[in-house]
From Swiss-Prot:
Domain of life assignment: Bacteria
The keyword Cytoplasm appears for this protein: yes
Molecular function terms, GO-annotated: translation release factor activity, codon specific
Sites bearing N5-methylglutamine, chain numbering: 229
Subcellular location: Cytoplasm
Function: Peptide chain release factor 1 directs the termination of translation in response to the peptide chain termination codons UAG and UAA.
Entry keyword set: Cytoplasm, Methylation, Protein biosynthesis
Signal peptide (residue range): none
Gene: prfA
This protein's record includes keyword Protein biosynthesis: yes
Post-translational changes noted in the entry: Methylated by PrmC. Methylation increases the termination efficiency of RF1.
Protein name from the UniProt record: Peptide chain release factor 1
Record organism: Cereibacter sphaeroides (strain ATCC 17023 / DSM 158 / JCM 6121 / CCUG 31486 / LMG 2827 / NBRC 12203 / NCIMB 8253 / ATH 2.4.1.)
InterPro entries: PCRF, Pep_chain_release_fac_I, Pep_chain_release_fac_I_sf, Prokaryotic/Mito_RF, RF-1
PROSITE patterns: RF_PROK_I
Length: 351
């Protein structure tokens, strides 16, 4: 049973926000009030449906004492009682604390791991997979930085994904992705294992954290062409080092000014994510064990091409739909990860 007094508090807060917005809140307050209003609206819809179901059940049970209405009540009561547990579960999920970063754009970083050129090719496959998934969701996918490898893979890629639920959905992708397949360069037909690392960070704004100029060192470098060929090189590439943490970010687009913007954007995202991780660890000693903790060293998934199989090791989910997944159809696996994370957080909240 969900505590009714807590539900009434939420409804009263929602009504207060609605009245403030209707009356014309101060311009400085409108954004914060509108954001809270939008977050509470789906919760209030669930509360309204739940309260209506409880009232309908109470009315039907009262009809049992009326001989003329008893038969009708006996028909309605089982269905009403059967609906309520599902509505309570939906309410519990709606009442879970929201991750403030879920509504933000996502910064996606992909790097090859062990496996040489095959790992670089797989990293490129992952980049295309996420781009197709983003396009299928109607999100904007912007490639911020790309360092290609000699055979058409990538040495490093950074992208920005913007759209409703972008970070909320993509945050489960952080970790080590392992691939098992026969490389195109393998003459003997042997299966090789290689890996790529994915990091998904919530985009941070300048107001989220201040980075003193004394804390960073900016270096300009000569940027190289595709495949490492130093053709048409310029001094536009930028490397920014955050001295307190040792974090280094680079950008090698054609415009040096744009490179500084991109590098600072990625640096802010990494520092913001670092602080989020610190706070999450402080809140819960078990957080590292939960899906979505963002541990970049955790092997989260295996893509087995000969078997057409993808296995997510965090939730023991295996899908024999690898071609569709690599083509960007990630909805089933991400939905399963979301449900698992919600269940873990519910258990933690109710413990």
């Amino acid at each position: 049973m969900v505590p009714m007094d807590r539900l009434l508090q939420i409804v009263r807060r929602f009504e207060f926000l609605e009245a403030r917005l209707s009356a014309g809140a101060a311009p400085a307050e409108i954004a914060a009030l509108s954001r809270e209003y939008a977050e509470l609206k789906p919760v209030v819809v669930e509360i309204s449906a739940y309260r209506t179901a409880l009232e309908d059940l109470a009315e039907a049970e009262a009809m049992l004492s009326d001989p003329e209405m008893r038969a009708l009540a006996e028909d309605e009561i089982p269905a009403l009682r059967a609906r309520i547990p599902g509505m309570e579960q939906a309410l519990r999920l709606a009442l879970l604390p929201k991750d403030a970063a879920d509504a933000r754009p996502a910064i996606l970083e992909i790097r090859p791991g062990t496996g040489g050129e095959e790992a670089a090719l797989f990293a490129g496959d992952l980049l295309r997979m996420y781009q197709r998934y983003a396009e299928g969701q109607g999100w904007r996918f912007e490639l911020l930085d790309l360092a290609p490898s000699e055979l058409g893979g990538i040495r490093e890629a950074t992208a920005r994904v913007e759209g409703e639920g972008a970070f909320a959905r993509l945050k489960y992708e952080s970790g080590v992705h392992r691939v098992q397949r026969v490389p195109e360069t393998e003459a003997q037909g042997r299966i090789h294992t290689s890996a790529a690392t994915v990091a998904v960070l919530p985009e941070a704004e300048e107001v989220d954290l201040e980075i003193p100029a004394a804390d960073i060192r900016i270096d300009t470098m000569r940027s190289s062409g595709a495949g490492g060929q130093h053709v048409n090189t310029t001094d536009s590439a930028v490397r920014i080092t955050h001295l307190p943490t040792g974090i280094i970010v680079t950008s090698s687009e054609k415009s040096q000014h744009r490179n500084r913007e991109i590098a600072m954007q990625v640096l802010r995202a990494r520092l913001y994510d670092l602080e989020r991780q610190r706070l999450a660890d402080a809140r819960s000693a078990d957080r590292k064990a939960q899906v979505g903790s963002g541990d970049r060293s955790e092997r989260i998934r295996t893509y087995n091409f000969p078997q057409g199989r993808m296995t997510d090791h965090r939730i023991n989910l295996t899908l024999y739909a690898l071609p569709q997944i690599m083509a960007g159809d990630l909805s089933e696996v991400i939905s399963a990860l979301t449900a698992h994370d919600q269940a873990a957080r519910l258990a933690e909240m109710e413990a």
